[in-house]
Amino acid sequence: MNDGTDAYLRQVREIALRVLAPYPVTVYLFGSRAAGGGRRLSDVDIAVESHGALPRHLLPELREALEESTVPYHVDVVDLGAVDPDFRERVRKEAIIWSGSRIG
């Protein structure tokens, strides 16, 4: 079943990469969409892992750009630097890397 989901995921990826392009980050798609089990109304989970200092406004700016887009799904943006280490490792192992490289 492809109800346009692939196009919307491409749009989420393009927005994230555009906003985050100047910064040393790795962007991941994780959760049900990455595992291929997402349902029609499932949200989209992306994680951002910084490999240097980021401006405080950056992730709120990314969230705003995603909210203002035509993507009909809620997009959760997770800062991997602010989560439990076990969760961070699970994302690193199970997610799809959209940009950057694994460090650490």
Spell out what each predicted region is.
Residues 45-47:
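Short, well-ordered beta-strand segments
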Residues 1-28, 34-40, 49-104:
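Catalytic core of pol beta-like nucleotidyltransferases
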